[in-house]
Amino acid sequence: MGGLAMEEMPLSVLFEQARKIHLAASESGVDQDVVKKGCEMFQKCEDMIGKLALFSSNETKEDISTNNLKYLLVPYYLAELTEKIIQEDRIQIVKASYAKLKEFFSFCEAMELVPDEELEASSRGGSGAPADRRALKIARFKRQKAAEAKLLEIKERKERRGRSTKASALSTPVESGEDDIPDDDSEEEREAWLSSINLAICKAIDLLEMLKREEEMLSAIKERQLKDGEGGFSRDALDDRTKKAETWHRDAAARIQYSKPAQPITCATFAQDVLEGRASVSQGHEHKNQPLIFGPASIVGGPLSTERERMIAQVFQPSHRMPTMCIEDAGLTEMNIMNDWQEQTKKAIEEATTSWYNDKPLRRKEEDEEDDDEDEEAVMKARAFDDWKDDNPRGAGNKKLTPCG
């Protein structure tokens, strides 16, 4: 889109094209040329609004038509796009964006669009109790969420009405009536633009505070650099550092082709080898963590031979007992204990199984002998009872008790 085409475009088309660029820059990163083109288009919109005299200082929001409400957002959109421009002199960008936001805020204040609590906070210059500032931010956040919800509701309502209109157009012809009223003059369109302006006011106040702090920080850094006699990092110095880093990495990559470093022995790799059967637990491994030595004991070399050396070594020692082995050694010890326990359990199971099979015939023989003994005892008992019955016939002991006896 060349300059001639931009000059020939009407205000409404130019505004919509610039707003699309602003939307794309807000949702995702765009090229700097596109951002600058959007700034030029919004500046052209400002010039056309001034030439057409769409707004007056003695007007309020009720006096502005629905078609012209959206043009109140031009300074805000221009400020946001300007803030996204990347250049070396960041302070100039911050100042330009801050000026446009102040212009937008002042114009909304004249149109009676800014809430009273925001006007009071602006008159105080940001000073006040922390609780008051916190309450103001909470109220601003609630207004922002309410405006976003309102815009979403209007958008969904338009989509539903569009679908129903399309369906009715396919079934019956459209009659002239209320559906012929332009959307630009409808209350819904006006409500949508007012909600957009309220949302922009909330975001503009937060952006003003952020830009003010950024300008103060950049000014302080610049003053310090001027005071120290430094103009900042020069481009040559940065290029020199980059070349040195690239050379070092290139040389390191060349050396790695001819030198193969030894594989470090770590506890993790040793334990993995033990678990997968490539190494035995009994094999010592080189990763040893020696316990820390504190106090004078750290400067005493060799064993403690005299009582004096032992007393010196006990000075400034920890109040708790130090570990006698590292975690890796403790794990290997536990693994040894587990392997011994498994071997003993396996051996006991094998012995129990073997003895059970070997003792089975002997147990069967003993059981047979016990059964034979029990049979003989039963026969002898039965024979003795038969002999007793022969010696004592039935009723022999009751003869003296009978009347005829």
From Swiss-Prot:
Acyltransferase in keyword set: no
Knockout or disruption consequences: RNAi plants show the formation of spontaneous disease-like nectrotic lesions leading to premature cell death. The defective plants also display a strong reduction in protein synthesis, the induction of autophagy and nitrogen mobilization.
Induction profile: By chilling. By abscisic acid (ABA).
Composition skew (Basic and acidic residues), residue ranges: 378-393
Gene3D superfamilies tied to this protein: TAP42-like family
Region of interest (Disordered), ranges: 159-189, 352-405
GO terms (BP aspect): negative regulation of seed germination; positive regulation of cell growth; positive regulation of TOR signaling; regulation of nitrogen utilization; response to abscisic acid; response to cold; TOR signaling
Pfam family, one: TAP42
Tissue specificity field: Ubiquitous. Highly expressed in seed, and particularly in the embryo.
InterPro entries, alphabetized: TAP42/TAP46-like_sf, TAP46-like
Modification after translation: Phosphorylated by TOR kinase in vitro.
GO MF terms held by the record: kinase binding; protein phosphatase binding
Family stated for the protein in its record: Belongs to the IGBP1/TAP42 family.
Function: Involved in the positive regulation of the TOR signaling pathway. Acts as a negative regulator of PP2A catalytic activity. Plays a positive role in the ABA-regulated inhibition of germination, probably throught its interaction with ABI5.
Something else known: Plants over-expressing TAP46 exhibit an increased abscisic acid (ABA) sensitivity in seed germination and a reduced PP2A activity. Over-expression of TAP46 also leads to the stimulation of the overall plant growth and the increased nitrogen-assimilating activities.
Name this polypeptide is given: PP2A regulatory subunit TAP46
Species: Arabidopsis thaliana
Gene: TAP46
